[in-house]
Amino acid sequence: MSNVTHQPKIGFVSLGCPKNLVDSERILTELRTEGYDVVPRYDDADMVIVNTCGFIDSAVQESLEAIGEALNENGKVIVTGCLGAKEDQIREVHPKVLEITGPYSYEQVLQHVHHYVPKPKHNPFLSLVPEQGVKLTPRHYAYLKISEGCNHRCTFCIIPSMRGDLVSRPIGDVLSEAKRLVDAGVKEILVISQDTSAYGVDVKHRTGFHNGEPVKTSMVSLCEQLSKLGVWTRLHYVYPYPHVDDVIPLMAEGKILPYLDIPLQHASPRILKLMKRPGSVDRQLARIKQWREICPELTLRSTFIVGFPGETEEDFQMLLDFLKEARLDRVGCFKYSPVEGAGANELPDQVPEEVKEERWNRFMQLQQQISAERLQEKVGREILVIVDEVDEEGAIGRSMADAPEIDGAVYLNGETNVKPGDIVRVKVENADEYDLWGSRV
């Protein structure tokens, strides 16, 4: 055990998705509450925590490199996060890591920190920790994680093996956290999980309580409650269950943002079956049409995989045909890559890398054209924009159709009389395939 007499300092690196970021925020909040200082430099710290990602091979490599960098610069390293579920893989490369825990193992991480860098006797920082906790996002938006794990067994994914089955947070806890965020100045709440639509399934949608009132543990009830907070509410990772239809009217009424992030993954029924994903493309197209009739302002974001094992040119053409008909607003596309432990690794007819690359290019070319056409329709219109950054040249923000980091931006050239978090009305003057340009009205 170390004998720490100074204010103990912890270095921290957070990798991966927003769900991992929320885990990091929770650990950092606890450390700050206990009196630890969090520092940006490894060589200044008494030890380093690396919160890893292990979803795809490139993420594993990035995590292993971050661990190595921390070991080289500091020497005392605790590893947590998704890759931590594969301890042998980490120890094979970095045997000198002090401790390894899996994802959302907050208590274990803190116990290990206490062992190697004991808690300070006095805690001058306690009163400085904000009620909403330590946040790694800008002050005006925050991620709200509503559950852990996932009950699906998609063949390309290993998340359930790392994060387990679905565990929904009590709805009272979720709503109380949301209220604290809004009280602290947050203007946009981004609801995240592995499967937001499944919220409450594991507890049979039991009734919880918030402010003494009964509230059902479900995505729809959660959206209804969040809409009362008077801030932007954005839904991510929404699996296309039937009850998703019930949140569209809330969007049409302006209660939550008209934005749905639905990872569809493919459009060939045969490939979707191999992926163990729902496979009725015609039904999905009909629902998209119905959603847009109810809520014309709806923005649809999705992600797809090309080059999945067994994908033929015919399967890929079905995907392109789906894109042409669905005309989604925001789309991400990944070339399939094997992930250790994923069922898809055992499938026959692996697609050659050059074919994956060629299909990815065709996919992106088509979607960029669709996206450019969708954004061009906004030129001349007035939209609301939340400001993210301001400098001497102007401001950069996002419309209701744009989530941070993954979607486009709205550029307000010369607009310096605003601050981050302001929501302003903008007339759109120009557009390309991803971004908009405009002036404040």
Swiss-Prot record:
Subcellular location field: Cytoplasm
Matches recorded under HAMAP family: MTTase_RimO
BP-aspect Gene Ontology terms: tRNA modification
Binding sites annotated in the UniProt record for [4Fe-4S] cluster 2: 150, 154, 157
Stretches assigned to the TRAM domain: 376-441
Catalytic activity reported: L-aspartate(89)-[ribosomal protein uS12]-hydrogen + (sulfur carrier)-SH + AH2 + 2 S-adenosyl-L-methionine = 3-methylsulfanyl-L-aspartate(89)-[ribosomal protein uS12]-hydrogen + (sulfur carrier)-H + 5'-deoxyadenosine + L-methionine + A + S-adenosyl-L-homocysteine + 2 H(+)
Keywords recorded for this protein, A-Z: 4Fe-4S, Cytoplasm, Iron, Iron-sulfur, Metal-binding, S-adenosyl-L-methionine, Transferase
Cofactor(s) of this protein: [4Fe-4S] cluster
Cofactor: how bound: Binds 2 [4Fe-4S] clusters. One cluster is coordinated with 3 cysteines and an exchangeable S-adenosyl-L-methionine.
EC number: 2.8.4.4
InterPro entries: Elp3/MiaA/NifB-like_rSAM, Methylthiotransferase, Methylthiotransferase_CS, Methylthiotransferase_N, Methylthiotransferase_N_sf, NA-bd_OB-fold, Ribosomal_uS12_MeSTrfase_RimO, rSAM
Name by which UniProt lists this protein: Ribosomal protein uS12 methylthiotransferase RimO
Domain of life of the organism encoding this protein: Bacteria
Its job: Catalyzes the methylthiolation of an aspartic acid residue of ribosomal protein uS12.
